[in-house]
């Protein structure tokens, strides 16, 4: 048995990874409850604010692969500390911004720190865990950004703003301090001799050119298949997550009711991410992937009937199940693909998220554009169901 499998300290490291991912979710969502006050203070239009909020995914697409290379060279300890530091710097820079351009670049900076944790987390888990425990570990760490986002939504206006005398800049400084403190905690945990020794086994020596690594990975059919599915999964998740409150509001709900109902998939997703990935052993992974994608497609279809509580509840539960586990199972499949492994997990993760975030950008834009053209979200929801059908055809080709 490998050293990482014997050591109970791997769970301590997993807690550190979870903390960094929590900082990711906290900072990513932090501006959403502050949009109104920031827009008023800086004199921004809704369009300008939308452009600012979309700055980091654009940078993410370009930076994911270089970040994956850096992670393979530097290792998870250094990379995840850098991630927390950049996330903290992004939050602090937002607090100092005094115009549209400054805020745009502050948010864009998050797109460099984000990939380091998104890619670094599965690489570290692939080092320290195997089999069902690896799937459980992935399910645990993916709850970090979800809970970080929930905390940002729940506490920014109810606690942080009153505590900071209503100053949104000071709130962002607070979140920057939390993120940096988390980075220091991670660095301390990852400096344990056992962690340092195991990490050294996964750091590439630079003998193989990274261009060759990229090409070798893309030659693997399972990798190409997973990348295509990742684009579809991010298209679905980002598209529906961004527009769900508005879909519910247009079905007749108040803004408060829509917010409550829209939180259901997040809560279900946390439970799903803890339970389902550990069941996705190699022999069952294809069947579970098909079931998750089918759940996503059915959820989009049921949301056509958001005015009726029964199909709405079923749709939101199914969305939460798919949202919590779909990407985790895909990432698990990728890192366990022959020819990838722990040594190239960073580079493979960089390719994965570079491809996936293309769907993440196109999803919200497409649903919004279709809504403008048709006057509603029905066509967009049908499109999501259709994409899920195509993903099922791809998932069937996954080999156990």
Give the residues covered by each predicted segment:
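Residue-level signature of mid-helix packing/kink "hotspots" within the transmembrane helices
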Residues: 29, 57-65, 150, 266-274, ...
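Helix-loop-helix hairpin linking two adjacent transmembrane segments in secondary transporters
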Residues: 140-191
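Cytoplasmic helix-loop-helix junction between adjacent transmembrane helices
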Residues: 106-144
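Cytoplasmic membrane-interface "Motif A"-like loop-to-helix N-cap segments
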Residues: 73-83, 281-293
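A late C-terminal transmembrane helix in Major Facilitator Superfamily
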Residues: 341-374
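C-terminal transmembrane helical hairpin of 12-TM major facilitator-type secondary transporters
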Residues: 284-333
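Extracytoplasmic gate region of multi-pass secondary transporters
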Residues: 31-32, 221-263, 269-273
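Conserved MFS/SLC helix-loop-helix module at the cytosolic interface between two early adjacent transmembrane helices
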Residues: 62-98
